């Protein structure tokens, strides 16, 4: 819906607050990168602000900049001064953990908000589709953004992912234990992506639950790399085989429909939700025709929101 058909999805208050805290942590890391390069200014292309190194130590200033930027970008999300203060407390808590152990300013920062776009040139990952008068072909790509990469020396790097929410598997409602995090798809795919980008480097993966459990660190190996690729292969083949997508809940009674998804909204006075309308369109016309009619072909392979990055949604349907 969002990536192939250009419908704009919902951002909820907790998610937006998490993005704000991520932005504060990113700026602290950007300060360290600037210092390593001998610079005295941090240029933030996202917010358009240039900050001195001294300003980068002002956590309240960073929080206010991030809060104002993202609330202006998402005016439909109603958060105010109470949430502004909460975001600041989260950032303060994050950098205070174990006497500043996870404060980016105390680390050797290799990169912040590192974007990856990995094309998997394997026979199983090849695709070819006909749309209107175009042929779209290539290989499956995975795209994303890593919060922070730390240089631990001797060719060893640590991928660090921040989480402000609960330590739950939202698909099952169960707590993510260390054992479950060892098989966490997001963390495995981070490892897979970075090993593709930097094959000569070694990576560990850490996830820091600021408000629910602290730091968990995993060391992956070649077997985990292969597991990650197998996850991708199975998901790709599953998606490719679908001709008639199923709704999570036909009547939108599932909690994800109620709390997380904007597509339950009515589609153009049709008496149907957006997802119901598209379901019926696919049933009548087929997937290809629906993508041709509703989609933006030039947007299908582009990256949306990630980390502090905002998608260009000028063509998105509200």
Where are the language model's segments positioned?
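Short amphipathic alpha-helical segments and their helix-coil junctions
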Residues: 1-8, 73-74, 165-172, 234-243
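Short, hydrophobic/amphipathic alpha-helical patches that form generic packing surfaces
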Residues: 1-3, 19-30, 191-192, 263
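Mg2+/Mn2+-dependent nuclease catalytic core
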Residues: 116-234
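Metal-dependent nuclease catalytic regions and adjoining charged, substrate-binding loops involved
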Residues: 179-184, 189-318
């Amino acid at each position: 819906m969002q990536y192939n058909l250009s419908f704009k999805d919902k951002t909820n208050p907790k998610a937006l607050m998490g993005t704000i805290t991520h932005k504060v942590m990113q700026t602290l890391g950007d300060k360290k990168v600037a210092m390593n390069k001998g610079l005295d200014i941090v240029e933030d292309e996202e917010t358009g602000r240039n900050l001195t190194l001294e300003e980068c130590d002002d956590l309240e200033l960073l929080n206010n900049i991030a809060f104002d930027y993202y609330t202006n970008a998402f005016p439909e999300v109603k958060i105010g001064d109470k949430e502004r203060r909460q975001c600041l407390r989260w950032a303060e808590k994050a950098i205070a953990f174990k006497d500043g152990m996870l404060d980016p300013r105390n680390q050797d920062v290799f990169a912040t908000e590192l974007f990856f776009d990995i094309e998997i040139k394997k026979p199983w990952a090849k695709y070819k589709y006909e749309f209107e008068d175009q042929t779209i072909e290539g290989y499956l790509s995975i795209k994303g953004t890593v919060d922070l990469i730390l240089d631990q020396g001797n060719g060893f790097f640590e991928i660090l992912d921040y989480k402000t929410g609960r330590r739950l598997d939202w698909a099952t409602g169960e707590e993510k234990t260390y054992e479950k995090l060892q098989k966490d798809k997001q963390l495995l795919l981070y490892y897979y992506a970075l090993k593709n980008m930097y094959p000569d480097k070694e990576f560990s993966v850490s996830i820091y639950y600021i408000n629910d459990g602290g730091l968990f660190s995993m060391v992956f190996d070649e077997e985990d790399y292969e597991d990650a690729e197998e996850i991708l292969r199975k998901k790709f083949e599953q998606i490719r085989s679908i001709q008639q997508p199923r709704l999570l809940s036909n009547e939108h009674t599932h909690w994800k429909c109620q709390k997380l998804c904007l597509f339950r909204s009515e589609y153009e006075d049709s008496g149907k939700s957006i997802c119901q309308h598209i379901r019926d369109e696919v049933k009548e016309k087929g997937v290809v025709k629906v993508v041709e009619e509703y989609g933006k072909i030039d947007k299908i392979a582009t990256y949306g929101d990630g980390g502090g990055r905002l998608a260009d949604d000028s063509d998105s349907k509200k």
